[in-house]
Amino acid sequence: MHKRTFSIAAGGMVLAAALGMAGISTAHAQSKQIVYLTPGLDLPFWRYLSKGVESVAKEKGYGFQALDSRNSAQTQLQNAQDAIAKGVAGIVLSPTDSSTAPAVLALAAEKKIPVVIADIGTNSGDYVSFIISDNFEGAKGVGEALAAALKEKGWAKDSVGLITISQARKNGQARTNGFRDGLKAGGATGSEAGLQQMQTYTADETFKYTQDMLTANPGMRGLFVQTDQPAIGALRAIKAARRQGQVPVAAFDGIPDFVDLLKSGEIVASGMQQPYLMGQRSAQAMFMHLEGGKPEKQITVPILVVTSKNIDKVLPTVKTTVFANEVK
């Protein structure tokens, strides 16, 4: 009787242990996932960065998911809550803007989920590492290239317009300030035709902003658009106004369409961040932390200032680190 009772009890203990181990295994399996919270996958830049994170996560045997915030801080917060509820191993965060990032960081910190920030930056909060491009120097190089193009045409004293990303973002502020310094350093001394901040980050939005700027400033001779896809809208507006060749356009980041546009001179320069490389660096910092290491608090990835004059030389690098091997 006692022997049987002991056997049953022992069997129960073995079963409980087995169930416990299964529970641990399941929880561990659930946690072997990296989530990337992105502002909006409609912009190629974020898609390329996402691919970089995914490539390293898969190398490490982890699952990966990108959650699109559709440029909404509220949606990004909800995405963060969903990821945290699933008990993910770590979050790579590109905030919708720097002022809303602390709310996401606070949620993750409460559940002890590590966060690596990729690109935009935060006003406050705890994080493992911040992977950033040197937006100021990149934009300064773009400003210098546009100034050179204006000087060649004899337009160095004419006005230049800016269509920017959100100036609530630290990277947006750096691009604006760097570009202004670059224009000045390059000898462009004209006034600023105006500054419009993007809201939807679409080519259609930039088309309208450019139309309005050209109408209000008929003497405008240059334009800086602070991200890639929207720059196509600016070119369309210049063409619609029959001002082709009269308003040189400089841009930031890069999409495959830029290759031919740079070669033709329709875009004179673009400060190309390397989003695929940034995504890889973000994931590498995360795994260093998960494996007990201590990554650098800030990791800077250089920006490639690509111009009509150097595009052929730098194109092999651009295809990999900028376009995530989507271009052959």
List PLM regions with ranges:
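Generic N-terminal leader/processing signal
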Residues: 1-2, 30
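A detector of low-complexity, intrinsically disordered, Ser/Thr/Gly/Pro/Ala-rich segments
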Residues: 3, 22-24, 36
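N-terminal export leaders
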Residues: 3-10
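C-terminal segment of classical bacterial N-terminal signal peptides
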Residues: 16-27
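A residue-level marker of the well-folded mature domains of exported/periplasmic proteins
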Residues: 27-328
